[in-house]
Amino acid sequence: MENVIIIGSGPAGYTAALYTSRADLEPLMFEGELSKDLTPGGQLMTTTEVENYPGYPEGVTGPEMMADFKKQAERFGTRIFSQTVTKVDLSVRPFKVWSGDDVWEAEAIIVATGADAKYLGLESEEKFMNRGVSACATCDGGLPRFRN
């Protein structure tokens, strides 16, 4: 029986891991498996440069930042499994989580599965990605665009 299971390994998942592990709750995180649609570490794994996050005065790549988050969570005792959760039962306690053939029970589950960028499906979107087309207005809004 687990105290806490965290589903997801983006910034929210690692923040949850940090707080719960520091509270001696010994969290178990399912970071997911690398596949066409899923990337452990969340959307930041595809971000080339992060300049708007405290603690990185020179900027950092998304993968470097997520590696730091993972290292810090593991330092405090978070156990991280590279498996994808396929089913969750929240109807009765203890809660149940399925991953492959394994079933896990937990007193609490934190779902931190993030978000996906939504595109219009236009042919030109891919062509102009990061050159005028963006999935993050707050991230990319301050960057100079459309220079000659």
Language-model-derived ranges and their functions:
Residues G8-A12:
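Glycine-rich Rossmann-fold phosphate-binding loop(s) that bind the pyrophosphate
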Residues A17, S21:
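Gly/Ala-rich phosphate-binding loop of Rossmann-like dinucleotide-binding domains
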Residues M1-I7, R22-A23, L28-S35, I80-R147:
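FAD-binding core/adjacent interface of flavoenzyme oxidoreductases
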Residues P40, M45-V103:
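N-terminal Rossmann-like dinucleotide/flavin-binding domain of flavoprotein oxidoreductases
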Residues G13, G59-G62, K118, G142-L143:
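Alpha-helix N-cap/loop-to-helix initiation residues
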Residues G13-T15, K36-T39:
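Short N-terminal binding/cap micro-motifs at the start of the first secondary-structure element
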